[in-house]
């Protein structure tokens, strides 16, 4: 080993400080970001053991426990709701099920919440990119009721509206309509949380999704009719929310109707030289997942975690590699992102997993690594605070310890790759960037951390390379 653990940690501390300064200085140079398609209201409740046990006993513990063993993956009864919550706690896994009836939706409202936040990947990123980084941001909102509009922070955040035949960009608070409240009920639990004899192996959340619009990737009239005009005003675009697509809908439409429109949007973005990032999320439907892989070549960049990567590799046809990726070792993950780049031709792949991030690019640049470091600080700030309100919150994350376990992976990479320096590996026709992340041991919230990571890395890398 070339350096002691202490020396390596000191090296990364310096790299983190430099990356923060470089990113913050460069971010004002970004002229505009477009975010589509999913925005909603996140209702957050921190689970209480006594309250949860009381509610489960009232409806019948045995029936609820049956759902843990045989998950319904949808909610049409209280047994389904609480069975889903307990399954999420038992596995320490983020689980999201759709709420199918109004009676359960009323129950969820009456159960109440601890916090209201803007939700959906596009909505969360808008408050970060526009509200904290102060970059002009245009965000798609399927509906814009007052409850949701008030959750957008002040800053250069805009939604397109028609005034007569003229397209205008205004803050969501200036575009309120009597529209549906699209609510995702999020039940958070910490590591070690115990209910009955079930204990959470790690912190996570269960989501009861009572949102009929984002479930279909509904697009507003303004986006359908004036997308080209909207695209002309931005340099970057981040697309998300496609993971919910189904093969068929009751009105006779299919996932293909949505993807055709998405592809037409991508063609416009590419025509105007707008760099686009696709935030991949686990997509249960295999056919939809296959189609999403098929359009990756139209994007500049994709962001995903190891579970999502494995689900893609399985579709590509290497089931053995997919299983190895899920085991979490760094070399199968590197093989998998190289395979994904071979298959799609995409320029940039950003993988975020617990403890470290990787970025595989077709270009060489120290800014790729610095962007990952900046994203790690943003993620740590989000975990600590629950919500990032100012850039100083990101700076405060410099004091969070760097993950020492990831240093072991760094040492293995050094042995495997001769061209390895300060987290950058020259792979002949590609560059691989590796960074150990900041780890917050008791996060206040886990919602939106992946979106914070990917958007911060994509936007700050572009800003620094542009500078």
UniProtKB/Swiss-Prot annotation:
Positions annotated to bind Mg(2+): 279, 308, 451
Ligand binding (D-glucose): 42, 96, 120-121, 184, 451
Active-site residues, record numbering mapped to chain: 451 (proton acceptor)
PROSITE patterns: ADPK
Cofactor: binding comment: Binds 1 Mg(2+) ion per subunit.
PANTHER family: ADP-DEPENDENT GLUCOKINASE
Protein name (record): ADP-dependent glucose/glucosamine kinase
Biological source species: Thermococcus sibiricus (strain DSM 12597 / MM 739)
């Amino acid at each position: 080993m070339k350096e002691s653990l202490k020396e390596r940690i000191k090296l990364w501390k310096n790299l983190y400080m430099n990356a923060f300064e470089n990113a913050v200085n460069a971010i004002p140079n970004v002229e505009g970001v477009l975010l589509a398609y999913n925005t909603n209201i996140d209702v957050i409740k921190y689970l209480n053991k006594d309250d949860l046990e009381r509610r489960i006993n009232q409806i019948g513990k045995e029936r609820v426990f049956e759902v843990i063993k045989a998950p319904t993956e949808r909610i049409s009864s209280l047994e389904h709701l609480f069975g889903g919550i307990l399954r999420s706690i038992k596995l320490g896994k983020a689980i999201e099920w759709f709420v199918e009836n109004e009676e359960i939706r009323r129950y969820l409202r009456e159960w109440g919440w601890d916090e209201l936040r803007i939700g959906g990947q596009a909505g969360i990123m808008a408050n970060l990119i526009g509200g904290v980084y102060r970059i002009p941001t245009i965000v798609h909102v399927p509906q814009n009721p007052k409850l949701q509009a008030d959750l957008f922070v002040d800053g250069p955040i805009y939604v397109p509206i028609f005034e007569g035949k003229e397209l205008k960009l205004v803050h969501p608070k200036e575009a309120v309509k009597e529209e549906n409240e699209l609510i995702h009920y999020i039940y958070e639990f910490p590591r070690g949380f115990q209910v009955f004899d079930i204990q959470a192996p790690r912190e996570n959340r269960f989501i009861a999704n009572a949102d009929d619009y984002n479930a279909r990737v509904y697009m507003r009239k303004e986006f359908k009719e004036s997308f080209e005009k909207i695209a002309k005003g931005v340099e970057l675009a981040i697309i998300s929310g496609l993971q919910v697509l189904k093969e068929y809908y009751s009105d006779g439409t299919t996932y293909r109707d949505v993807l055709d429109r998405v592809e037409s949007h991508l063609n416009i973005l590419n025509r105007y030289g707008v760099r686009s990032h696709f935030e991949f999320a686990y997509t249960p439907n295999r056919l939809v997942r296959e189609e999403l892989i098929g359009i990756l070549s139209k994007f500049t960049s994709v962001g995903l975690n190891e579970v999502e990567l494995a689900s893609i590799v399985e579709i590509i046809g290497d089931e053995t590699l997919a299983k190895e990726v899920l085991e979490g070792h760094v070399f199968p993950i590197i093989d998998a992102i190289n395979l994904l780049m071979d298959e799609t031709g995409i320029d940039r792949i950003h993988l975020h997993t617990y403890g470290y991030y990787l970025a595989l690019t077709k270009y060489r640049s120290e800014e790729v690594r610095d962007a990952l470091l900046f994203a790690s600080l943003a993620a740590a700030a989000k975990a600590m605070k629950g919500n990032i309100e100012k850039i100083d919150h990101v700076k405060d994350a410099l004091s969070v310890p760097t993950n020492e376990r990831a240093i072991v992976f760094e040492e293995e990479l050094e042995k495997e790759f001769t061209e390895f320096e300060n987290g950058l590996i020259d792979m002949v026709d590609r560059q691989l960037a590796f960074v150990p992340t900041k780890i917050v041991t008791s996060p206040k919230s886990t919602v939106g951390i992946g979106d914070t990571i990917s958007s911060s890395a994509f936007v700050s890398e572009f800003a620094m390379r542009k500078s």
